Amino acid sequence: MGKIRVGLIFGGQSSEHEVSLQSARNILQAIDGERFEVSLIGVDKQGRWHASQASNFLLNADDPGRIALRESGENLALVPGECSGQLQTAANAHPLAQIDVAFPIVHGTLGEDGSLQGLLRMANIPFVGAGVLGSAVCMDKDVAKRLLRDAGLKVAPFVSLTRSKAAGADLSAIVEQLGLPLFVKPANQGSSVGVSKVKREADLRAALDEAFRYDHKVLVEQAVIGREIECAVLGNERPRASGCGEIVLSDEFYAYDTKYLNEDGARVAVPADIPDEACQRIRGIAIEAFQALECSGMARVDVFLTPDGEVVINELNTLPGFTNISMYPKLWQAAGMSYRELITALIELALEKGRMDEALSRSCQY
């Protein structure tokens, strides 16, 4: 049996482009070369797909602050239909590699929000991670929190605002409703991009303006006092949860720079130094949230553990980072699963989901 052909898709047009490059580099280094043959598909900031080479697809690869995609002169196109998984040159339709399964690691908008997943679904290519619905729901913090709340899971009180609603909003009433401090964040962004912590009502308008730079909808959320705990979930219909890890901050909050550029801004503690009973509750809640939001493949579930032991869900990330300091792979490594085994498990789950989709009837019989 030949090797399974994996299309590793990375980069993208979002503000998390550079994070995706770091993740792709680590996945490429960890993947089992005896089982998988990798085609690198780099997406530049204009949305063009490039055929990348493993030996030189990154510039400044060892510097998270300057890492960049080396754009090839050969743009790619994806052929759907009977030639499912066929890559070809965009200029002259010259056939290149054909892929059996895609591993999208394009973080943020147009990669993690169901857009790329929809393209792969239409092209009939199995892919790692959540499907169209789960990806879109988890990306939209407003919709995700409403569904979690309806499922009986605890989330922080919040208000969602569009730009037009925010223009005429009574900010004093919002502060009175939610209290201070507040967090203001774009509804459809990850990696803490555009997030502000507001301690004074006078700063709320500026925080809204900053968040609206990145999205048309913004969340104003009550700050939760508690420890930041993360749990990794892996699986399709029978998901399992890892142990718990903790983000121990030295900065004000877990901002973009703290996550990816300043390794001294936070410390990742795996396992988290919390009571076993609390960790078991968090693991159960993580699986409930994973299923409530129609996730599959993988997700990192971020929660707060308050001083009185309450678990408040912050968010679910359906394409968690695979950078050097990312929590998702660290949690599974602590559970005894190596980086390589994790990558293999994710690809196998994608193929399993693809077989289930393929078995569905696509015609009406009377």
Swiss-Prot record:
Extract one GO cellular component term from the record. Answer: cytosol
Which InterPro entries did the record assign? ATP-grasp, ATP_grasp_subdomain_1, D-Ala_lig_Van_CS, D_ala_D_ala, Dala_Dala_lig_C, Dala_Dala_lig_N, PreATP-grasp_dom_sf
* Presence of keyword ATP-binding: yes
Binding note for cofactor: Binds 2 magnesium or manganese ions per subunit.
Pfam families for this protein: Dala_Dala_lig_C, Dala_Dala_lig_N
Q: Which residues form a coiled coil?
A: none
Q: Molecular function terms in GO for this entry?
A: ATP binding; D-alanine-D-alanine ligase activity; metal ion binding
- Sites where the protein binds ATP: 175-230
Q: Name one GO biological process term.
A: regulation of cell shape
Q: What is the purpose of this protein?
A: Cell wall formation.
Family statement drawn from the similarity comment of this UniProt entry: Belongs to the D-alanine--D-alanine ligase family.
* Protein's name in the database: D-alanine--D-alanine ligase A
